[in-house]
Amino acid sequence: MSNWPYPRIVAHRGGGKLAPENTLASIDVGAKYGHKMIEFDAKLSKDGEIFLLHDDNLERTSNGWGVAGELNWQDLLRVDAGSWYSKMFKGEPLPLLSQVAERCREHGMMANIEIKPTTGTGPLTGKMVALAARELWAGMTPPLLSSFEIDALEAAQQAAPELPRGLLLDEWRDDWRELTARLGCVSIHLNHKLLNKARVMQLKDAGLRILVYTVNKPQRAAELLRWGVDCICTDAIDVIGPNFTAQ
């Protein structure tokens, strides 16, 4: 297998802005638009279940409240993660990573799993997500693991070294070369605003694949692809579709 089997366009948090993020419903919406790869955020419940949620807290994307990682899975099961977005999605639950893997299998979709630890749980979350991903995605294209948290990526590297890893950065770091080498990363995942053509060439010359987020304007997506960016992560999954090209 190539170390980069992934498509050009990735649906951010499953269904971009067209569904409640990080839910099975959002993955179905991404699939409906023909997307072949999704990005989503994974963290641990207090009792060690791996589920999808972006924020530390529940308030923004559910009717729950407080720090999600301080609750047991049975409590998190009661949370409605759909109504905040639309009545159409009322009762949509927080999904387990195992359910997401099954949905990816059904839809033939690849995955970028962002390891999103609750504050202070980086190493444990990195290890648990990597070990689970190895089992759950067996026989499928390996999921691309990424994180802003260095300690989470280190733990993922130790737990499942064969799974591809990407370093996430929201600000440029001059030590990107050393960091990606130490973590054995195949890719670097950057806020697209950090990039110009020269930086893209520099990263590519170092042998890294480049994923950028979150690009919602087709003109910008086309420019980035022309520069040599490998992957565009977008919320505008209807406008920047799975067959989008730089032309």
Swiss-Prot record:
Cofactor: Mg(2+); Co(2+); Mn(2+)
Keyword terms, alphabetized: Cobalt, Cytoplasm, Glycerol metabolism, Hydrolase, Magnesium, Manganese, Metal-binding
Domain of life: Bacteria
Annotated residues for binding of a divalent metal cation: 39, 41, 114
Induction line: Up-regulated by low levels of phosphate in the medium.
Catalytic activity entry: a sn-glycero-3-phosphodiester + H2O = an alcohol + sn-glycerol 3-phosphate + H(+)
Entry protein name: Glycerophosphodiester phosphodiesterase, cytoplasmic
Organism: Escherichia coli (strain K12)
Lineage, uppermost ranks: Bacteria, Pseudomonadati, Pseudomonadota, Gammaproteobacteria, Enterobacterales
